[in-house]
Amino acid sequence: MAEHIELKRVVMVKAIVTEAFKENLIKELDRAVKNIEMQASQMDMQSKNYLEDLKKKGLMQKAAAFKHQLDDERTRQAAAKSDLMMKIEEAKRLEIGTEFVQGPLEGPVKVGIGDNLYKKVGGAEIIVKDGIVQEIRGAE
């Protein structure tokens, strides 16, 4: 019978907000907005030619279905861009010294007989400041 087993657990990464962190976060979000805009522009150019080609061939139903798909994709891209713009505004309002949740990572944890499973697998956090680990919380 095994005495230990290694499991995966979620470790939350939080960043201490600094000016450099805010600048990098805003640049990253802005880059994502520009990427969406570029994709939308390319999609518009390519789809215009494709739609004209379908209409020339008399494939009106196919053109209508494609236009519907195109409209759905434009709506999705507009929503994604709007979401990113809101995140940029939120990033600008972040206060220096506060903690910002960057997201989860998976990490291994060794669990043995007699361990409290809930303490071992739950609630671990890594606190970073400008990419440097400052603190590890809840790692039993």
Identify the meaning behind each predicted range.
Residues 1-26:
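Short, charge-rich amphipathic alpha-helices with coiled-coil/heptad character
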Residues 22, 29-36, 40-43, 70, ...:
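Amphipathic alpha-helical coiled-coil segments
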Residues 36-62:
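Extended alpha-helical coiled-coil "stalk/arm" regions
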Residues 52, 56-86:
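Long, charge-rich amphipathic alpha-helical coiled-coil "stalk/tentacle" segments
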Residues 74-124:
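Coiled-coil termination/hinge junctions
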Residues 127-128:
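Hydrophobic alpha-helical segments used as single-pass signal-anchor/transmembrane membrane anchors
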Residues 137-138:
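Short clusters of small/polar residues that mark proteolytic maturation junctions
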